UniProtKB/Swiss-Prot annotation:
Binding site for ATP: 55-63, 78
GO (cellular component) term, any one: membrane
Lipid-carrying residues in chain (S-palmitoyl cysteine): 422
Location, primary (coarse class): nucleus
UniProt modified residues of type Phosphothreonine: 189, 336, 366
Protein name listed in UniProt: Serine/threonine-protein kinase STK11
Residues found modified as Cysteine methyl ester: 433
Lipidation (S-farnesyl cysteine): 433
PANTHER family: MAP/MICROTUBULE AFFINITY-REGULATING KINASE, NON-SPECIFIC SERINE_THREONINE PROTEIN KINASE
Length: 436
């Protein structure tokens, strides 16, 4: 018998196979019949913070929701990779500057820095901030008009001026005031954020003269668009706040251009128009804040004394609500940490043998909000001379209790999955440095 002969083997020839069709041999399953098992969300602890879902992502890094396992406060953490910061011009310097500025600021309308954690092994920094439910730009983009009702815009603008006045009183020029850097809490409190390009004036400076600017082009004043070497820092913030007010009340920008060169050319000339429906009081305030000459431009005191600022505006239109979450479409913006809490506590008894969740080792709490480094410890020799020896310390002044490779006796190691570790011990796990 010929092996190549298909008949004795009960096989079809190529022609017969094509005539019968492949559907006879391959059973097709409709997608509606497939039951998809969602991937289990695995809990992860960074220090004492339980990680939630992604809130947003920018050029510097990701922002995630976290829960403080000690206070149960809802927070947001900005995750920064040192490798990524090196690729951004002035990236590391801007982050360091922002941390140094935020640690000294305490105001209702300025974002608060709660904690800074650093993982030396993974070269990651975690900036833990107070939680804000939404950004102003996100709210503007959620409505077709791209603007707020006058009553709502007035309330936000008053808070912006309060926060800006506080920053200026501390000798800080923000340099990048815009809706994208203004965040909102659940109760409508405005928070000025993103101080990465801000400048702290010298304590004994005679004026507010600045020489550099890295702000968003559409919000820059004529003196920067025209390339002046020096300019008034406070008046730059007044101009940017004026452009912001123009934008949130009209849905437009006072100056536009097809590219940055055209945009700066239009800003440099200083010619703009205000829509008629703004009304005389608001138009007068906008012209004062967008004055071409910095010396004639409104100060914060003049803004506070203006009739539009002091007036109580009636609620003529429906307020713009906080939009649903862009990913989950959750209109209430519920806590994304809840599924991870269930994984953390709900399955501990059933899966005692497993490593139920991840804890990043080597976390260092830097309570003065700078990156950990080395300091020199003076040791006096027999000849009376001092010898400086490098000694690794946490920046809060405490010595590390443990190396990332050395574990104390009797303490469960999270790096070894074979060991049984109860969830309560993992939650209470101390960082590599003593907290003061």
């Amino acid at each position: 018998m010929d092996v190549a002969d298909p008949e004795p083997l009960g096989l079809f020839s190529e022609g017969e196979l094509m005539s019968v069709g492949m559907d006879t041999f391959i059973h097709r399953i409709d997608s509606t019949e497939v039951i998809y098992q969602p991937r289990r969300k695995r809990a992860k602890l960074i220090g004492k913070y339980l990680m939630g879902d992604l809130l947003g992502e920018g050029s510097y890094g990701k922002v995630k929701e976290v829960l403080d396992s000690e206070t149960l406060c809802r927070r947001a953490v900005k995750i920064l990779k040192k490798k990524k910061l090196r690729r951004i011009p002035n990236g590391e310097a801007n982050v360091k500057k922002e941390i140094q500025l935020l640690r000294r600021l305490r105001h209702r309308n300025v974002i608060q820095l709660v904690d800074v954690l650093y993982n030396e092994e993974k070269q990651k920094m975690y900036m833990v901030m107070e939680y804000c439910v939404c950004g102003m730009q996100e709210m503007l983009d959620s409505v077709p008009e791209k603007r707020f009702p006058v009553c709502q815009a007035h309330g936000y603008f008053r808070q912006l001026i309060d926060g800006l006045e506080y920053l200026h009183s501390q000798g800080i020029v923000h340099k990048d005031i815009k809706p994208g850097n203004l965040l909102l809490t659940t109760n409508g409190t405005l928070k000025i954020s993103d101080l990465g390009v801000a400048e702290a004036l010298h304590p004994f400076a005679v004026d507010d003269t600045c020489r550099t600017s890295q702000g968003s082009p559409a919000f820059q004043p004529p003196e920067i668009a025209n390339g002046l070497d020096t300019f008034s820092g406070f008046k730059v913030d007044i101009w940017s706040a004026g452009v912001t007010l123009y934008n949130i009340t009209t849905g437009l920008y006072p100056f536009e251009g097809d590219n940055i060169y055209k945009l700066f050319e239009n800003i440099g000339r200083g010619d703009f128009t205000i829509p008629c429906d703004c009304g005389p009081p608001l138009s007068d305030l906008l012209r004062g804040m967008l004055e071409y000459e910095p010396a004639k431009r409104f100060s914060i005191r003049q803004i506070r004394q203006h009739s539009w600022f002091r007036k109580k505006h009636p609620l003529a239109e429906a307020l713009v609500p906080i939009p649903p979450s862009p990913d989950t479409k959750d209109r209430w913006r519920s806590m994304t940490v809840v599924p991870y809490l269930e994984d953390l506590h709900g399955r501990a008894e059933e899966e005692e043998e497993e490593d139920l969740f991840d804890i990043e080792d080597g976390i260092i709490y830097t309570q003065d909000f700078t990156v950990p480094g080395q300091v020199l410890e003076e040791e006096v020799g027999q000849n009376g001379q001092s010898h400086s020896l490098p000694k690794a310390v946490c920046v809060n002044g405490t010595e590390p209790q443990l190396s990332s490779k050395v574990k104390p006796e009797g303490r469960p190691g999270t790096a070894n999955p074979a060991r049984k570790v109860c969830s309560s011990n993992k939650i209470r796990r101390l960082s590599a440095c003593k907290q003061q």
